[in-house]
């Protein structure tokens, strides 16, 4: 190796060649780079394999030596091992006439649960036999008389992933059995028959007999922490990687080049465009729509601290989010301050501002002089960036950090190419790896590294002549692998592999060739394919297409830097291809392109300027394509997810203002194409002028030549105005914008302060004026309305059924998400007017008459006119502004009316006016019809119901209960912040003050309430959380009975905001089980048993 300085002319011609002594001065740096880099990489790679301290948990029963039921819902559904021993004499409590109601000696699920036999273990009396049933399989059966006989010693049961076995020790098979005289035992294998455990339940009471034992090893493989060895290795790995990067930097300085400043000049200054972008982002932070998964992620983050790891709370049996959980861990730390939406999304706002700063300060200057000096390019970049960011990245999902990570990775690579140094490459590897493991869509970040392989290989080749390959590659290898340390800091390699195999097996896990599903959703009239989302993607594709076309035609876009421009285009293409390999296909994944969209927008703006695209015809055709993209985008709804949709104009219809916007835009497209044809056939010059244009003409030309900038900013304006208008039109009712602005004043509980709950609907019943309570409902006229004129099953019709829903069916093949307690049924005892209909919302049949028009067989016309009911005074009406009637059936709103009258009018048999009810619920289930008391004149003192059912179709019928004025309290006051709550994943961000039920050591906390979104959202998200997917619904439906509580949204009475359910345990006296905890060291390859998959 040369020891003398290279000639100055060589330094000027080839800056990456040596200009300094590379011998003694850099020998230490070379050794450090090799040793520290290789050791750092080895330690990082070894991190997943190093041992951890696992907290073990054992569920033992009986507890306190008595027959007492305990709750222990396992988040993984099953124990790794289960051993049960039951003395035969313990079954004596099930025998005899005095124990007729006692049937279960021991079970892992409450016997009352609908799927108890299918999923759990029950040792129960069936007729005169004692039967052990495991997942709907009678494993072993013995006559109760033999069990209580002298020869029977005990029943033993063991369950492992590969087999389950049970035996009545002391008893033998009868003469008619397959093996007469053999021990009475049963066994099943070939399938995972381990029963689901939500506790240990029994119908017996009193002291437990000696020898009774239930021992379950809870699956706590993810409740682990690093051992001192692993902690030391991680610290050393990070330190060695840092040392290797320092050594690489020293080797980089051997080129003798002056250090370039890290930040561009005047990076801190702001212009008018910067101010506008900042203003839009900040305002959108308050009024803008959020993403559908914000509640999902927020709940995971909130629960993780107590749980000890970042579990996928809503699916996949509580397995961890790793390797994609590090970003969520940061959100968990952030949530320590507040869980309010404006606070939790503050990092997202910071990422948005950083993205724009990088685009405007780093990306645009690197793309060439034409891009740097073009105002059209800057405005198009800003418009494209906002058009993608606003609808796709204003939440807690990882797309914002991935979008930023892609930009920063590209900037690091470009710095490496520009300076011929390798430290920026190592930094790019770290940023790229962190971006990759921010979420599944982080796979898009690999493009930033792949597109620069050519120039980076050249740099490496030049420098390897002086330092060798290993001193240069080892630090980069350490940088590329160091992210394994935070990802596997407290988890093992085997555990993560099993978790990811489970997720793939349970699904959803779509293949690369299913990518068309993402685009099908993009073109559906739903929030997934809304105007904003559709335009964002189509505009990005258009910008990519024109940039590629111009680059292919002319080698590069005139006036741009060829290398950076090609790499930006390459990154985008590779990102689209990489997205094919994500396991789910949702349109919110396009949020990762926000930064690239701004960069491509700048390129596309220059590509269609007069200097680059001289043909007026071609520029006009491009403008026509932009208008067509607008037309195609407006052929959808202006829809947003859940509460973000409240009050938004055209949220359920195509935008229309006197005429259809999509049709008008399509007609405009045709006109612009005709103009292009005119340029082609008539005025086919290149459009160049020799005269100096006026200032007005120059500005007009700039606008005309920037159709993409105009379109993007029009869409940004449309989105901002839509959500601002929603907040204004909703006021004083709840909206996202109002809630976020109120949070600045300390009101941070969101929707919980505006949802009004009616705990006791019986208290608000209006009193009949003359007729007895039992007869008042039909006192005026009752033709074919009878107390039992209601079908036994009034389950609500599904509101949605989309392609792919079959992946999320419950065991009955039905889409879950209905409101329990509203599906009807019958009762054993008749109500006050002889009806046996089961009433919803805790209505008392002893005080609530009901009449319906349905009958078995041929239907007949039916009419109902109730007696008069007394209205409260005007002062009382002001405190309770709503009148409600609980109804069921399928009918039009005009068929059920409320009439009012004064005392004099009522006495004369006349009414003073009438109105229709607002029907918010889902037919034909029970729901609350609503009427605002403000619509009733203050002089009215009485009301009555009038119903007319002239439709003879069997599915068309009406059932009514008496009117009432609800006595309500806020959900925040009823549920509070202390009770454990099952927050559906769509509602988590809207209810930040409610405490989601936790889990620790593999056992879930038992929730007392469940909060659901609107019915559309409930049907969409409930299947994700069900038993098939390993979610909490598979636990709560076995442990508790859900009952819907009547609720209303303040000042927005006719809104389906969602539902509140009270969860009542099947065994109210059951207490949380005490677990026996321990600690054991496990290697990174240890596995206790396969994870349950169904």
UniProtKB/Swiss-Prot annotation:
The chain crosses the membrane at residues 28-50, 232-251, 264-286, 341-360, 373-392, 431-453, 466-488, 530-552, 565-582, 586-608, 620-642, 657-679, 700-722. GO terms for cellular component: cytosol; plasma membrane. It holds the Pfam family Arabinose_trans. Residues 817-836 are annotated as: Disordered. It is an enzyme of class 2 (transferase). Its EC number is 2.4.2.-. This is Probable arabinosyltransferase C. It comes from Mycobacterium tuberculosis (strain ATCC 25618 / H37Rv).
């Amino acid at each position: 190796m040369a020891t003398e300085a290279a000639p100055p002319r060589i330094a000027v011609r080839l800056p990456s060649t040596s200009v300094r002594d590379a011998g003694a001065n850099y020998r230490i740096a070379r050794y450090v780079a090799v040793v520290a880099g290789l050791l750092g990489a080895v330690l990082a790679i070894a991190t997943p394999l190093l041992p951890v301290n696992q907290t073990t948990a054992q569920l033992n029963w009986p507890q306190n030596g008595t027959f007492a039921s305990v709750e222990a819902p396992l988040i993984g559904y099953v124990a790794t091992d289960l051993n049960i021993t039951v003395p035969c004499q313990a079954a004596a409590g099930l025998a005899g006439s005095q124990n007729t109601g006692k049937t279960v000696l021991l079970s892992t699920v409450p016997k009352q649960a609908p799927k108890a036999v299918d999923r759990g273990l029950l040792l129960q009396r069936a007729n005169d036999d004692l039967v052990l049933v495991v997942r709907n399989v009678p494993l072993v059966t013995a006559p109760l008389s033999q069990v209580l006989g002298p020869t029977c010693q005990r029943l033993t049961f063991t369950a492992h992933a590969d087999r389950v076995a049970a035996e009545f020790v002391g008893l033998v098979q009868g003469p008619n059995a397959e093996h007469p005289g053999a021990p009475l035992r049963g066994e099943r294998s070939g399938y995972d028959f381990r029963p689901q455990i939500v506790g240990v339940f029994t119908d017996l009471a009193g002291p437990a007999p000696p020898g009774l034992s239930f021992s379950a090893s809870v699956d706590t493989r993810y409740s682990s922490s690093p051992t001192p060895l692993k902690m030391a290795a991680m610290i050393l790995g990070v330190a060695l990687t840092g040392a290797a990067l320092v050594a690489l930097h020293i080797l980089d300085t051997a080129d003798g080049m002056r250090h370039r400043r890290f930040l561009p000049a005047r990076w801190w200054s702001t212009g008018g465009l910067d101010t506008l972008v900042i203003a839009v982002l900040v305002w959108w932070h308050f009024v803008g729509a959020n993403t559908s998964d914000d509640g999902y992620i927020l709940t995971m983050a909130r629960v993780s601290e107590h749980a000890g790891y970042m579990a996928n709370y809503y699916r996949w049996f509580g397995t961890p989010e790793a390797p994609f959980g590090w970003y969520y861990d940061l959100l968990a730390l952030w949530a320590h301050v507040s869980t309010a939406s404006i606070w939790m999304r503050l990092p997202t706002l910071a990422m948005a501002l950083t993205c724009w700063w990088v685009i405007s300060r780093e990306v645009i200057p690197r793309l060439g002089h034409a891009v740097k000096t073009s105002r059209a390019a800057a405005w198009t970049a800003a418009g494209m960036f906002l058009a993608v960011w606003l609808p796709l990245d204003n939440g807690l999902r990882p797309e914002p950090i991935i979008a930023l990570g892609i930009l920063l990775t590209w900037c690091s690579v470009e710095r490496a190419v520009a300076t011929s140094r390798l430290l920026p490459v190592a930094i790019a590897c770290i940023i790229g790896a962190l971006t990759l493991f921010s979420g599944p869509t982080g796979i898009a970040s690999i493009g930033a590294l792949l597109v620069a392989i050519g120039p980076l290989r050249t740099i490496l080749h030049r420098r390897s002549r002086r330092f060798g390959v290993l001193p240069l590659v080892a630090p980069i290898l350490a940088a590329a692998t160091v992210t394994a340390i935070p990802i596997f800091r407290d988890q093992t390699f085997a555990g993560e592999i099993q978790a990811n195999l489970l997720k793939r097996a349970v699904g959803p896990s779509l293949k690369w060739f299913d990518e068309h599903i993402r685009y099908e959703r993009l073109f559906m009239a739903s929030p997934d394919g809304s105007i904003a989302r559709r335009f964002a993607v189509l505009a990005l594709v258009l910008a990519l297409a024109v940039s590629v076309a111009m680059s292919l035609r002319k080698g590069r876009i005139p006036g741009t830097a060829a290398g950076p421009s090609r790499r930006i285009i390459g990154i985008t293409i590779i990102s689209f291809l990489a997205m094919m390999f994500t396991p789910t296909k949702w349109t919110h994944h396009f949020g990762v392109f926000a930064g690239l969209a701004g960069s491509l927008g700048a390129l596309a703006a220059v590509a269609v300027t007069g200097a680059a695209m001289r043909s007026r015809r071609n520029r006009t055709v491009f403008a026509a394509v932009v208008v067509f993209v607008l037309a195609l985008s407006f052929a959808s709804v202006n829809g947003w997810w859940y509460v973000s949709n409240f009050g938004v104009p055209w949220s359920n219809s195509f935008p229309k203002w006197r005429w259809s916007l999509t049709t008008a835009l399509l007609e405009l497209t045709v006109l612009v194409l005709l103009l292009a044809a005119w340029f082609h056939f008539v005025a086919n010059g290149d459009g160049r002028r020799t005269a100096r244009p006026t200032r007005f003409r120059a500005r007009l030309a700039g606008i005309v030549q920037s159709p993409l900038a105009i379109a993007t900013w029009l869409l940004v304006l449309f989105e901002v105005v839509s959500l601002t208008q929603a907040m204004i039109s909703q006021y004083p009712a709840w909206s996202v914008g109002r809630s976020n602005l109120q949070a600045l004043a300390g009101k941070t509980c969101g929707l919980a302060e505006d949802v009004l709950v009616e705990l006791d609907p019986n208290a608000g019943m209006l009193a009949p004026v003359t007729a007895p309570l039992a007869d008042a409902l039909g006192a005026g006229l009752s033709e074919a309305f009878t107390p039992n004129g209601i079908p036994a099953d009034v389950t609500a019709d599904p509101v949605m059924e989309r392609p792919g829903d079959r992946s999320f069916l419950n065991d009955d093949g039905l889409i879950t998400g209905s409101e329990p307690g509203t599906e009807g049924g019958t009762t054993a005892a008749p109500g006050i007017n002889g009806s046996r209909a089961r009433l919803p919302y805790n209505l008392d049949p002893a005080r609530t008459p009901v009449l319906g028009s349905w009958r078995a067989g041929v239907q007949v016309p039916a009419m109902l006119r109730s007696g008069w009911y007394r209205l409260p005074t005007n002062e009382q009406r002001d405190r309770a502004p709503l009148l409600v009637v609980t109804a069921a059936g399928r009918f039009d709103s005009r068929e059920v009316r409320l009439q009012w009258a004064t005392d004099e009018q009522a006495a004369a048999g006349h009414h003073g006016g009438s109105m229709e009810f607002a029907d918010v619920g889902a037919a034909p289930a029970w729901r609350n019809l609503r009427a605002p008391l403000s619509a009733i004149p203050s002089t009215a003192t009485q009301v009555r119901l009038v119903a007319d059912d002239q439709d003879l179709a069997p599915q068309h019928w009406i059932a009514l209960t008496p009117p009432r004025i609800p006595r309500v309290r806020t959900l925040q006051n009823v549920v509070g912040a202390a009770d454990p709550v099952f927050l559906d994943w769509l509602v988590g961000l809207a209810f930040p003050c409610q405490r989601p039920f936790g889990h620790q050591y593999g056992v879930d906390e038992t929730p007392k309430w469940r909060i659901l979104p609107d019915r559309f959202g409930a049907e969409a998200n409930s299947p994700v959380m069900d038993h098939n997917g390993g979610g909490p619904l598979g636990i709560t439906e076995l442990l508790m009975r859900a009952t819907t509580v009547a609720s209303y949204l303040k000042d927005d009475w006719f809104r389906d905001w969602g539902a509140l359910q009270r969860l009542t345990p099947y065994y109210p006296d059951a207490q949380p089980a005490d677990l026996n905890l321990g600690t054991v060291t496990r290697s990174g390859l240890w596995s206790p048993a396969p994870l349950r998959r169904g």
